[in-house]
């Protein structure tokens, strides 16, 4: 049985963070050492990013927030809201992106209507709430209330792949299955000022957005499928556990992103790909 990815759509928050402006703010924080300031400039410049989308409107230079929680334009200080405050914003703003991306994926897939969705998989590692995004999507889009719902949480940025793999398995088990996969991350909720290289790298690289896909083995007339989902493989490397991590702290989630990660991938990528190519 052949399983296809029939549509793929994205959604981003409207606020745009300009990279040079963000770099200037983070480099000017009073707690930075000279080395920390140099790291900020290096990481932000070498990221090769011009703009990023953020759900935190007050992170922009022209913010007019009356009671700022993330950035105070009057003093130029990056603030440190609690994890509770950050997660509360996630519950509100992530819901919007989950729903928008899911709606766009449905609209981009002629022949598939909301009641046709049999399985819903949501993915995120930047916040939690319950009833969760799966529930919100069902209600907002009018999905069948009996739809099978699953959430992959806190697996990190690769979680879209096991989500697609699960969708493929559902479709192979049931030829009539149609799976909606929706991923959303609000990384900018967890920005902070620090001299720590991993934290600086996270603040320089990541942003906010969502993506949704519809996967099915059904024969649907109209536009050709975007992708055929043939085979998935996964492998754990013997090293790297301490080089990449994501932990919950008192002032947001804390990233570990060592500069050795590309070398680990380089050393093990061939072995990981061999089962796919054999």
Task: Cite the ranges covered by each PLM segment.
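Hydrophobic faces of stable alpha-helices that mediate helix-helix packing
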Residues: 95-102, 265-266, 270
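Acyl-thioester C-C bond-transforming condensing/cleaving domain
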Residues: 92, 99-116, 125-249
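Condensing-enzyme catalytic core mediating Claisen C-C bond formation in acyl metabolism
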Residues: 1-89, 178, 187, 193-267, ...
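Residues within well-ordered alpha helices
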Residues: 42-43, 105, 137, 276
